[in-house]
Swiss-Prot record:
The keyword Aminoacyl-tRNA synthetase does not apply. One of its GO terms (molecular function) is structural constituent of ribosome. Keywords: Ribonucleoprotein, Ribosomal protein. Gene3D superfamilies: 1.10.287.310. PANTHER family: 60S RIBOSOMAL PROTEIN L35/50S RIBOSOMAL PROTEIN L29, LARGE RIBOSOMAL SUBUNIT PROTEIN UL29C. One of its GO terms (cellular component) is cytosolic large ribosomal subunit. It holds the Pfam family Ribosomal_L29. Belongs to the universal ribosomal protein uL29 family. The keyword Ribosomal protein applies. This is Large ribosomal subunit protein uL29. GO terms for biological process: translation.
Length: 74
């Protein structure tokens, strides 16, 4: 499974970004819980989930900053 690209996420709305961030945080928590209870976990899933989470949080922050800049200019 390849890591997702940022351009794939640009089409998402703000609400979709927020829900995906929450979903990824839950998935990471579940993965950590499985690892702590010594269940089978694929280690690469940590990397993929953290990568996606970072991309979404970056996108969310970029949108916040552009919104602030437009409100300051007006």
């Amino acid at each position: 499974m390849a890591l997702s690209k940022m351009k794939d996420l640009l089409d998402l709305s703000d609400a979709e970004v927020e829900t995906q961030i929450l979903d990824l945080k839950r998935q990471l928590f579940q993965l950590r819980l499985q690892k702590a209870t010594r269940q089978e976990v694929k280690p690469h899933q940590f990397k993929h989930l953290r990568h996606q989470l970072a991309q979404l949080m970056t996108l969310e922050r970029q949108r916040q900053l552009t919104q602030q800049q437009t409100s300051v200019q007006e």
